[in-house]
Structures are given as structure tokens and as C-alpha cells.
């Protein structure tokens, strides 16, 4: 199962921006392909996404990253065993030699890392989730469906980035997807009835100019009920306010409401919402380096809701270990391009599970038809996945792959529902 050839090319993501696609060819004739995603709101501590910075594509071209694959990584990987994922990833990390993959680019390294796993699975003739997770890979994730977009994901006056529905009361993944899709369509009617536009944002959710951040919760509850479900029982609410984007000079600025909050006031804000709405998960409720604030938030709400670190942990085992040691958060969002290799991503998931932290596999706002994360969610029995709304084919590709996996597992498939939450 030795690597014979590696090639990369520049392709486009769901926002029309360039990204890296890699193909790994084995001496057996089998191959694997992968496209890396790209984020809009990115954590400071993420692996470097190498962009060209020239006149092409407004500076967002990735020809340098492609060149690094074709001229630096490819020659070094020829002859390595594709089934030794750790060794392949370690070789690429050694070639890069920087803590943030800043020399070759996290996007270059990740594309090859994921394509290698696909090639190995293809040669063995097993589904990717089974190759990565073995015979115990059988848990379908509860979807976090981002149906209202704001913040950096939409051009509107909603401060918080994502308002999501979680079908925690569904019996199977297939039914969970139906619950979410029906709520999405009901929400469109609710918004139209209030005179709001029903255009969608980067992740397929609606992006209306609401009167306030809280109105997003109100229309969401109305949509859940109009779809025939009970808020909190059948469908709960999850939030990603992406507060790092709102944090300046020690204050959280809610521009749509014309006010700024201290860390303690932001914690009070979340406690109030949790007490009045069926919110079960808050991601990045405070800024990425507000560690003292995160401790306060965890002490206040950690036994009531899932507190997810995205920008806080950036899928980095070292930052996650710090969070575990200091009692910060209780769940991690896993984005493979934040850390830049499959091995490091799975290390972070394993550390989280050992420490009884929740795990959510996540897309980015700039996606593609590649559905790798669907297989990764099942492979690791993560229990939760965040991959957009019931709209846009780049999001639906992941849901459809999960439907295929559920069918393939048959009676062995497990859907945890509310039990998946930390």
C-alpha cells in the first residue's frame, strides 16, 4: 500500500474562493482525493492557511500551497505506506518544521493527509468510516443545523453567528434530518410572514435583518412549533455566537443592540437566555483567550448546558489539555483544518473522550462536495456534527453521506439523541 504519486490542484470552495485539492495514488492502482475547507471566522491559534496574496482571486489564490504539495511533500512521501497515517502525517510535519504549519501551509498538509486516508480505505475496499474507526464505529451524530446565520457568516444586523436546531428527540439520524429540514422550511414561512427576506448565508441558513438577537430565538421557537415539534423535547437550540469576533478592548460589543458587556455581564447574558429558552449548547460563548472568563462561564453553566470550545481549543491537543486542567468548557469542536492533519485531529478527539468532554465534528463556512467529516463523525463515535442547514449542496453532501452510512450499518446504527450532549 505504498504511495506512488501525490498531486495537488487549485479548486474552488462553496464561496467561490480557491482551496487545495490533493490526490494520493498508490502502487496498487488505488487512489484517494480530498478538498480542504476554509473558515470565515478563524481562531488566532489555527494552523496557517497559506494564501498567495497576489492579484489573483483578490489575493486568495492557493498556488503556493499547491506548489508545496507537488514539489516538497510529494517527493518525500513516495514509498511511504499509506496505511501508516501517523507516519505520513509526521513526515509532513517534519518537512514543515513550524508550530503552525506556516512554511508549507496547513491547507497543503491537510489535503494530503485526508487524501492518504481515503486512498488506504479504497485499497482495502472498506468504507472510510470503518477504515478510520474499526468495527465499533456505529454512532450516527446528532446534527446541529445552522438555520439562522449572523455575524461573519451573513451581511445582516444579527451579532451572533449561528442559531442552530438539534433534533435531540428523534429516534434515528434519518428522522433527525427530517425534523431539521421540516423546521427549516417552517422557519422560511415564519420569516416571510414577518416581512423578512429569506436569503441564505454561507452555511445555508437564513440571514434576515431581525429587530434584535433575541428575535432569532423567538422565530426559531415559532418555527419548531409550526413544524409540529415540541421545543426542548423534540428539537433543542444550540448557539455559536462566535464572541471572539465581538471582543475588543476587554468588552463584548453587541453592535445591533448598541451596548458593550464585560465578561461577567456576558456570562449573565448567557445564563439569562439559558433560563428562558431550550438552549442545550453554546459554542465560543466567550473569546478565545478569555480564559478567566471561560472558567467563570463553566462554573456558572457547565452543569446545565454544553459549553463548546472552537476558537478556544482550535482542535489543538495542547490547548485542549490546558482547558481540561483548568476546568474550562466541557466539549470541543473539531475542525480538521484548524490543526492541519488527520492524526492530530484524532488525537484531540481521543483526549476529549478520555476527559469526558463532548465532541462535535464540524465543517467550515467555506466548504465543498467533500464529505470526509461525515465519515469522521461516525468513525470516532463523536455523537454530534455541525455541518450547516438543510440547504446548499455543499452542506447536504455531508447529510446524504450520513444517510448512506446509516443504511450500511443497518440495525447496528446508533443515534444517541439527547444522550450525545455533554
UniProtKB/Swiss-Prot annotation:
InterPro entries: Enolase, Enolase-like_C_sf, Enolase-like_N, Enolase_C, Enolase_CS, Enolase_N
Active site, renumbered: 203, 335
Subcellular location: Cytoplasm; Secreted; Cell surface
Cofactor comment: Binds a second Mg(2+) ion via substrate during catalysis.
Cofactors named for this entry: Mg(2+)
Top EC group: lyase
Stated family: Belongs to the enolase family.
This protein's name: Enolase
GO molecular function per UniProt: magnesium ion binding; phosphopyruvate hydratase activity
Binding site for Mg(2+): 240, 283, 310
Chain segments annotated as transmembrane: none
Organism of this sequence: Deinococcus geothermalis (strain DSM 11300 / CIP 105573 / AG-3a)
Biological classification of the source: Bacteria, Thermotogati, Deinococcota, Deinococci, Deinococcales
GO CC entries: cell surface; extracellular region; phosphopyruvate hydratase complex
Keywords assigned: Cytoplasm, Glycolysis, Lyase, Magnesium, Metal-binding, Secreted
PANTHER family referenced in this protein's UniProt entry, alphabetically: ENOLASE (PTHR11902:SF1)
Catalytic reactions of this protein: (2R)-2-phosphoglycerate = phosphoenolpyruvate + H2O
Pathway in which this enzyme or protein is active: Carbohydrate degradation; glycolysis; pyruvate from D-glyceraldehyde 3-phosphate: step 4/5
Amino acid at each position: 500500500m505504498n504511495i506512488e504519486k501525490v498531486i495537488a490542484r487549485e479548486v474552488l470552495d462553496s464561496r467561490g474562493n480557491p482551496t487545495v485539492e490533493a490526490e494520493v495514488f498508490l502502487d496498487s492502482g488505488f487512489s484517494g482525493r480530498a478538498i480542504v475547507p476554509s473558515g470565515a471566522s478563524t481562531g488566532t491559534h489555527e494552523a496557517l492557511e497559506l494564501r498567495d496574496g497576489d492579484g489573483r482571486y483578490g489575493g486568495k489564490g492557493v498556488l503556493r500551497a499547491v506548489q508545496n504539495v507537488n514539489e516538497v511533500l510529494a517527493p518525500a512521501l513516495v514509498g511511504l505506506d499509506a496505511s501508516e497515517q501517523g507516519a505520513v502525517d509526521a513526515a509532513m510535519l517534519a518537512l514543515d518544521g513550524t508550530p503552525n504549519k506556516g512554511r508549507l501551509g496547513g491547507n497543503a498538509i491537510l489535503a494530503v493527509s485526508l487524501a492518504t486516508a481515503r486512498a488506504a480505505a479504497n485499497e482495502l475496499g472498506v468504507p472510510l468510516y470503518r477504515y478510520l474507526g474499526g468495527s465499533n464505529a456505529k454512532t450516527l451524530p446528532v446534527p446541529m443545523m445552522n438555520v439562522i446565520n449572523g455575524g461573519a457568516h451573513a451581511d445582516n444586523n444579527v451579532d451572533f453567528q449561528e442559531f442552530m436546531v438539534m433534533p435531540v428527540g428523534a429516534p434515528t439520524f434519518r428522522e433527525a434530518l427530517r425534523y431539521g429540514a421540516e423546521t427549516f422550511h417552517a422557519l422560511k414561512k415564519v420569516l416571510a410572514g414577518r416581512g423578512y427576506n429569506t436569503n441564505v448565508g454561507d452555511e445555508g441558513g437564513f440571514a434576515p435583518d431581525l429587530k434584535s438577537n433575541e428575535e432569532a430565538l423567538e422565530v426559531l421557537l415559532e418555527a419548531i412549533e409550526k413544524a409540529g415539534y415540541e421545543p426542548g423535547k423534540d428539537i433543542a437550540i444550540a448557539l455559536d455566537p462566535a464572541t471572539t469576533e465581538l471582543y475588543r478592548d476587554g468588552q463584548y460589543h453587541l453592535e445591533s443592540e448598541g451596548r458593550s458587556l464585560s465578561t461577567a455581564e456576558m456570562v449573565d447574558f448567557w445564563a439569562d437566555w439559558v433560563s428562558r429558552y431550550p438552549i442545550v449548547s453554546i459554542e465560543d460563548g466567550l473569546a478565545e483567550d478569555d480564559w478567566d472568563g471561560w472558567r467563570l462561564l463553566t462554573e456558572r453553566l457547565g452543569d446545565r448546558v454544553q459549553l463548546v470550545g472552537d476558537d478556544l481549543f482550535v482542535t489543538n491537543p495542547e490547548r485542549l489539555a490546558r482547558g481540561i486542567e483548568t476546568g474550562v468548557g466541557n466539549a470541543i469542536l473539531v475542525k480538521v483544518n484548524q490543526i492541519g492533519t488527520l492524526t492530530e485531529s484524532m488525537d484531540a478527539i481521543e483526549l476529549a473522550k478520555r476527559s469526558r468532554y463532548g465532541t462535535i465534528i464540524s465543517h467550515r463556512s467555506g466548504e465543498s462536495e467533500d464529505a470526509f467529516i461525515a465519515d469522521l463523525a461516525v468513525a470516532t463515535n463523536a455523537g454530534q456534527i455541525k455541518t450547516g442547514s438543510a440547504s446548499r449542496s455543499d452542506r447536504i453532501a455531508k447529510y446524504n453521506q450520513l444517510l448512506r452510512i446509516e443504511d450500511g450499518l443497518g440495525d447496528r446504527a446508533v443515534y444517541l439523541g439527547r444522550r450525545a450532549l455533554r
